[in-house]
């Protein structure tokens, strides 16, 4: 769809494991390069993705994280399943992260919009 939109020169598609792809992007540099990133991958590694993406996003850039409500399971304090605990933990971390501002949207399974502060 981005070819039809005429923005194919601005998008680079990379297919592969998220963690190693992010590590490759960091190695290739430069930091603060990307305008936007969308995180929707292995939930237990969300915190690792967040920290790596935060390095890659320019000040003023946007990070979008999907599934932040995890079908409501993040609200069940008795649920200690790894993916649920990871998302719950990241939600709390982002809320108190002075590097960013955020807005959590109740769309479908929850989406967090994160703005990287200058």
Stretches with model-predicted labels:
Residues 1-118:
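S-adenosylmethionine/decaboxylated-SAM
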């Amino acid at each position: 769809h981005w070819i039809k939109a005429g923005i194919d020169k601005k998008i680079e598609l990379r297919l592969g494991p998220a963690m190693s792809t992010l590590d490759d992007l960091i190695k290739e540099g430069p930091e603060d390069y990307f305008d936007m990133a969308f995180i929707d991958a292995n939930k237990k590694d969300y915190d690792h993705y967040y920290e790596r993406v935060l390095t890659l996003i320019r000040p003023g850039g946007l990070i979008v994280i999907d599934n932040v409500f995890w079908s409501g399971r993040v609200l069940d304090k008795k649920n200690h399943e790894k993916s649920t605990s990871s998302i719950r933990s990241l939600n709390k971390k982002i809320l108190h992260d002075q590097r960013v501002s955020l807005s959590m949207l109740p769309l479908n399974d929850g989406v967090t919009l994160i703005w990287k502060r200058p």
